[in-house]
Every structure is written in C-alpha cells, then in structure tokens.
Amino acid sequence: MRELVETLDAIPLDDRTETLTTSITAEMVTLTDQHEHATEVRLPSDEIYVSVAPYRSQTHDCYYHSPTGCLGELRNADVAVTVTDATTGETIVDEELRTLDNGFVGIWLPRGIETSISITHDGQTATSKLSSVDDDAQTCLTTMRLA
C-alpha cells in the first residue's frame, strides 16, 4: 500500500495522464480510469498519508489529495519537516525532505492523533495543525504559507 501511494504521488508532471485520476482519503486510495471504472484500495488501519504543499504566493483549496491532479508551487525543493504530537509533545517526524515534482511532500502519520506540523524552506517557515483522528481526516494540506 505504501509503495502504491508513494509511487502515485511521485509521478512526474510530464508523465501525468488524463486517463487516470486518483484520490487519497483517510481511508483509501481510489484510482479511476477514463471509462469511470474505479478501484479502491484501503490504507493501513494504523496510518494515514498526508500530502503537504508549502507555498510562498500560489496555492489551491484542497481537502483530499489527488496525486494526479494537485499541483503545489515549490516543485523539487528541499524542506525541513517537523511533526509533533500536540498532546504529548513527542516528535513524530524530523526530516530533511525534498518536495516531489508536484510540489508536495508526503508524510505517513499514525492514526488517532492531533499534530503540529512545521515546514522550513530557504529560511522561511510555515506552521499548521493537522489531525488524523477522524475517518474523514484531511489528506491534502495546502494552507502552509512560508513567511
């Protein structure tokens, strides 16, 4: 499952096709072909995949990530990502990552927690809250404006 999700999110923009659309919710990945035939694959019961697109000036509204449709501003950019459990203060993610060609960085989080996420790029930082508590939790975070 992880490999499928990460492969979909890493599709280079030039390789995107209009014959496949995808969506990632907190519960499953849905792949739909040009004939509207859909295949659903459940996500792990203990994890949720969240795609985050930090930005400076341009973003889009999104709640459920579409690896074949969403486009973030900072493509192939180095970012520092820190995710902290808002209740315990435990650091869940503390990594130097690179945004994908679509401008997003993908993060696997444990289910059932409230977190604080911080992303830094070129000396600018954005911070947000993110929840993996509900079955309809957000999987696309596009509101992290770097300042």
Feature-to-residue mapping (PLM):
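A short, solvent-exposed beta-strand micro-motif common in secreted/extracellular proteins
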Residues: 113-122
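Glycine-centered loop-to-beta-strand initiation motif
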Residues: 99-107
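Extracytoplasmic low-complexity, Pro/Thr/Ser/Ala/Gly-rich segments
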Residues: 1-37
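Extracellular beta-sheet/turn segments enriched in Thr/Pro/Gly and aliphatic residues
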Residues: 41-43, 48-55, 133-147
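Surface-exposed loop/edge segments in extracytoplasmic proteins
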Residues: 88-96, 125-129
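Hydrophobic beta-strand positions
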Residues: 31, 83-84, 98, 118-119
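Mid-length scaffold segments of soluble, non-membrane domains
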Residues: 43-93
